[in-house]
A protein has these predicted regions:
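Hydrophobic anchor at the beta1->P-loop junction of P-loop NTPases
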Residues: 38
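Conserved P-loop NTP-binding catalytic core
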Residues: 50-115
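ABC ATPase nucleotide-binding domain
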Residues: 29-31
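Conserved lysine of the Walker
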Residues: 46
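N-terminal pre-Walker A segment at the start of P-loop NTPase domains
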Residues: 2-26
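Short acidic, glycine-rich loop/turn motifs
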Residues: 21, 92-96, 128
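Electropositive, glycine-dotted interaction segments
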Residues: 97-234
Length: 234
């Protein structure tokens, strides 16, 4: 985290975004900066890159499965180009100066169920620093089991009953037993996406409301005036 001004204290800069097998993105690793502008022709993957970041944010709210279902299910969102082999596997991840996170989603291996096409979380990993290394791992999940690293470097089982549609980021995070997961979860939940901000006459941003100091504009832009004034003052 960079803290050169009061506004910077609420920012957490991502350095890298990685996506594999999502829509038009077969395998992509993108370096990021404080302001990153993505350009390209229609169909080049700009929207897919943005959606992948939103899916990562949904992981912190246990909303990724529903989000993928709204897109037509995992089979509809997978890379469908030439050269696809092996099991269905959608991989997403990001890294910053303090934390990194990666998740692998696939299809369930279960018997009779009405939800047989729901994606399930196969593996997850959380690490400190910008690079995923065994020594940097602070938490990892495989199937229904998640473990976290204690202060002395030893591993401790945090859960053996994670449901396939629940992320360890949302389920295992704890201020005492898994503080790194808690910090990561809260920062992921603080991400904002403004692609659906309304501008019509009845838009939330056009309605009267009491303004308070607002360091981050809300998803719907309802606190636009307060956020603008906060920026002017800090």
């Amino acid at each position: 985290m960079r803290t050169s001004s009061p506004v910077d204290k609420v920012l957490w800069v991502l350095d890298t975004l990685a996506v594999a097998n999502y829509r038009s993105l077969r395998r992509l690793v993108v370096p990021l900066r404080r302001c990153t502008v993505v350009t390209g022709l229609n169909g080049s993957g700009k929207s897919s890159l943005y959606r992948s970041l939103r899916l990562l944010a949904d992981m912190a709210r246990n909303g990724a499965v529903n989000a993928l279902a709204r897109e037509g299910g995992l089979a509809s969102t997978m890379w469908a180009g030439p050269g696809r082999r092996g099991p269905v596997s959608l991989k997403l991840g990001f890294a910053g100066e303090e934390f990194g996170y990666a998740v692998d989603l696939g299809l369930p291996q279960v018997g009779k169920t009405a939800f047989g096409l729901d994606p399930e979380i196969k593996t997850e990993a959380v690490w400190t620093g910008p690079w995923l290394r065994p020594a940097a791992l602070t938490a990892e999940r495989s199937g229904s089991m998640a473990r976290v690293r204690d202060d002395d470097g030893s591993w401790r089982i945090a859960s053996t009953a994670l449901r396939p549609y629940d992320s360890m980021v949302s389920e295992v995070a704890d201020p005492r037993d898994a503080p790194e997961l808690l910090a990561l979860r809260e920062r992921m939940r603080s991400w904002r996406f403004y692609d659906h901000v309304r501008t019509d006459g009845a838009a939330p941003a056009r309605q009267a409301r009491i303004g308070t100091r607002t360091m981050v504009l809300n998803h719907d832009g309802a606190d636009l005036a307060a956020a603008w004034q906060t920026i002017a003052e800090v």
